[in-house]
Amino acid sequence: AVFLGFMAEYYLEYRAERHKEHDYLVSMKEDLKVDVTEISTRVSAIEGLKEKSLKLEKTLYKTVWTESDIDSIYLWSLKLTATIIKPNFTSNTVDQLKNAGGYRLIKNQEIVRKISEYEKWKETIRVQEEANQLNWRKIHEAQNRILHVTTLGTPKAINDIQIDRTELNRLKALTGSEFLTTDKKEFYQYANDIWVQRGYASYYQIMIKIEQEKAKELIHLLEEELAH
């Protein structure tokens, strides 16, 4: 009777853990689907950033700027630094698993390995983000040396960048230039900083695409496990 009672208790604990495992796997799959969508959004944003930065570089190297060129320099510059390229990864399920004692509740070791790989690559991406931030700081500093940023209008939505052309004309009449400097070397250095950052952004794009593929592989593995 004692043995049977022990076995019954063990079975109940086993069933409870399997229910927990199932819930965690379902939750993990949903988190990963959100990550896949989020990464797609950021990949698209990086494509737009690369396109804008290339146009901006070419414009900065022009010998003579038209009023349209000057407006473009302002708009592309400000849109460049307003573009969000960093994915907002979900971590709810992973955090819950860690709080529950790690991945011990997950019996499929291939899933455990894939989750660990996914989380490890996420940390590698975060290291790259620190390097990106250093380059963004250089670009911000260059913009503060070159642009009358006080002509920036109040945005009504994300990436809604508007330039107050009337204010820019007023500053031109007051200072003699639509920019804070007339030194072309400042603009060339700015173009150089943008080129460097485009390279970093391109590499970052590759990294988050790799993470997206890891997420898709893990989703497939989770779906197979949940189908059993």
Q: Model-predicted segments: where are they?
A:
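Hydrophobic membrane-insertion alpha-helices, especially the h-region
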Residues: 1-7
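Long, hydrophobic alpha-helical segments that serve as membrane-spanning/inserting helices
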Residues: 7, 11-228
